[in-house]
Amino acid sequence: MGLKYFAHLPLELREKIVRDHLQEERKKEFLEKAIEDSCRRHEALLIEDPSPAELNSLSKFLTALSDYVGNQFNTRCLIRWKKDVPSKVKFGFMDEQHHKLYGSMDMDDLSCGELFIPDEEDDLTYEDGVIVRCSQLDQLFKSLGIEIVYIVVSKHCIWAPLSKEIVIK
């Protein structure tokens, strides 16, 4: 609503609009702080040899965060794994995503870590049952006119593109 029209509204209505706006801002700020705290807690799970419970906790958190960020931007949100993240964490997460989407189909005694060249320099993500290089996926989506956002996970940092940039180091 334009400011010139806002000034002509009755005082009670203007106060209600301002109150509602401030309430939404406080909710958003509270959520961002909660996400920031959760990122800090889950950063500790980006270790060389996480337990299955730790990996499950990280997976649930990143999945929920991805859904939230995707809803905020009204687009698809993927997890972008940097090279420095331990393979057991990165591929364990992708393994779990695959099992949630497809069950054990196409995964007979095969670990996701065995599917990829370990010397790869590019960031990775998991999309529709496939481990993909982010640069290739970006090119494909750009050519199709599809916008995506990423939550970037590196060895000691989880970055989510929210209205207030959240970077945990």
Curated annotation (Swiss-Prot):
A motif (LXCXE motif, interaction with host RBR) lies at residues 110-114. The keyword Iron does not apply. Keywords: Host-virus interaction. The keyword rRNA processing does not apply. Residues 9-22 are annotated as: Binding to host SKP1 protein. Interacts with host SKP1. Interacts (via LXCXE domain) with host retinoblastoma-related protein 1 (RBR1). Interacts (via LXCXE domain) with retinoblastoma-related proteins (RBR). Belongs to the nanovirus Clink protein family. Interacts with and disrupts the function of host retinoblastoma-related proteins RBR, which are key regulators of the cell cycle. Induces transcriptional activation of E2F-regulated S-phase and G2/M-phase-specific genes. Inactivation of the ability of RBR to arrest the cell cycle leads to the stimulation of viral DNA replication. This is Cell cycle link protein. It comes from Milk vetch dwarf virus (isolate N).
